[in-house]
Each structure stands twice: as C-alpha cells, then as structure tokens.
C-alpha cells in the first residue's frame, strides 16, 4: 500500500507533509523498511526513507525492518561472527547527507526536518530504531543457535553491550525461547546474567 505519489508531491505545500502525510502513516499504523543491502543500506541515504521513519515514530506507527531473502543469510552470519560490521553499517546515518531524486523534494524534506525535530533528533531516532532491530534480530539468532555454539558465541557479549545501552537488561536476563540449554546474555561490567 502506498500513501503518496512521490512524483506529484511538489504540488503539495510543506505544511501538508508535516501533518497529513504523517497522519496517513499513523492511520496505516505500520511502515516496512526494506534494508538493502544491509552492509550499506540505501534507505539510510534517501531523504524520503528517513522522513518516513520520522513520521512513523511521531505518529506512533510500528516500524518493521525487513531484509531481502538474498541478504538474510549474510546478515545472520554477521550477527554471530562479525557483529561490528552490523554496527558500522548503521552508524554512518546522517540525515544532512541524505539525497532525493528531485531537488524540490529534498528541500521540502529538509525544511520539514528543520522546522520540526531537527537533524540531530532524527539521526538519533533512526539509529535507535535500527539498533532496536539489530538487538531483536540478535536475540532471535541467539535463541536459534544450538546449545554448544550458543555458550561460546561472541553474540552473547555483543548483545549484552547493545541491550545494556538500550536499557533492556531484563531481556538480557531472559532470552527468548529459554530452555535448559539457553544461556543468558552476558553484560560487561556486571555479573554473568
């Protein structure tokens, strides 16, 4: 489902984008962000995508991050074996460097961001949303590892750091689908959970 024909958006005033567009996203109650390629996510360089993430947050809608099937296996491997590459892939988000095909669209989006939340707030919001998704994906991946691999996986420590930074220590103490062979996430600077 689409809410706006972006090719005719220049006919709408900036105030519309700050109100009606956000209300449309809120009415739908859900935005799906297709993060591809995950190592250098194109949506993080596109002004429209970042604007939609802001509107999603401000309207109280749910954001779901999806990877294409062709990216999923590589992302899962990185969760377990190269967690830092995932952190690096999202750390470079900067709304000020985002682009749009139409200069008028870019000007409109920048104007709305400047008049509203501001660049720093939007950058922080996007990073928080992506880090939440990374943590959720990591918890799911940890639960799927077999017991012997799980107990030795660097993912335990990586998730501990990430969950601690997000204030989600309760989730570190109670991993999903806990069973007799599921190990709690380790949080550096504290006892093993």
Question: Could you say what each language-model-derived stretch is?
Answer:
Residues 1-165:
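The feature represents the membrane-entry module of six-transmembrane cation channels
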Residues 147-193:
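A detector of tandem-repeat and repeat-rich interaction/domain scaffolds
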